[in-house]
Amino acid sequence: MNTLRLNIVTPNGSVYEREDVEMAVLQTTAGEMGIMYGHIPTVAALKTGHVKVNFHNGNEFIAVSDGFIEARQHQLSIIVQTAEPASEIDVERAKLAKSRAESHLEDDDDNTDINRAKRALERANNRLRVAELQ
């Protein structure tokens, strides 16, 4: 079986790379999408969620924030602000981030950036969900 090369990139560089991907399943703004070797060239907006990476002897989940994908016949590039494999998620740290975001949202302080706090809460909840998939 032909396989796909997957590269997940953040502003800090490449955080996940694999050459033997049989299929990657991800959530785009248009819905769930599966990418396999030979996929037609595609660019799509990605929403906060997870990427399920299927390979010969198993699968992995990676928590990702909003971003974009570019699929070519033999390569999938995912460009996001943050990405973290489920196996590397620090659940306690994610719980602290969730608590911090919730307290910012409850705060009546005019200096609180509500949209930023909502995004932080969404990322923390996503990391906690993906950690459970591991």
Curated annotation (Swiss-Prot):
Tell me if Membrane is a UniProt keyword of this record: yes
In what ranges is there compositional bias, type Basic and acidic residues? Answer: 94-104
* InterPro entries, per database record: ATP_F1_dsu/esu_C_sf (IPR036794), ATP_synth_F1_dsu/esu (IPR001469), ATP_synth_F1_dsu/esu_N (IPR020546), ATP_synth_F1_esu_C (IPR020547), ATPsynth_dsu/esu_N (IPR036771)
Topology in the lipid bilayer: Peripheral membrane protein
Q: Does the keyword Membrane apply?
A: yes
Q: Which domain of life is it from?
A: Bacteria
Keywords recorded for this protein, A-Z: ATP synthesis, Cell membrane, CF(1), Hydrogen ion transport, Ion transport, Membrane, Transport
Q: Name one Pfam family in it.
A: ATP-synt_DE_N
What GO terms fall under cellular component here? plasma membrane; proton-transporting ATP synthase complex
> What segment(s) does the record annotate as region Disordered?
94-115
GO molecular function terms listed in the Swiss-Prot or TrEMBL record? ATP binding; proton-transporting ATP synthase activity, rotational mechanism
Q: Please state where this protein is localized.
A: Cell membrane
Return the similarity comment: Belongs to the ATPase epsilon chain family.
Q: What does this protein do?
A: Produces ATP from ADP in the presence of a proton gradient across the membrane.
**Which NCBIfam families does the entry link to?**
ATP_synt_epsi, PRK00571.1-3
Q: Subunit comment for this entry?
A: F-type ATPases have 2 components, CF(1) - the catalytic core - and CF(0) - the membrane proton channel. CF(1) has five subunits: alpha(3), beta(3), gamma(1), delta(1), epsilon(1). CF(0) has three main subunits: a, b and c.
Q: What is this protein called?
A: ATP synthase epsilon chain
Q: Which organism is it from?
A: Staphylococcus epidermidis (strain ATCC 12228 / FDA PCI 1200)
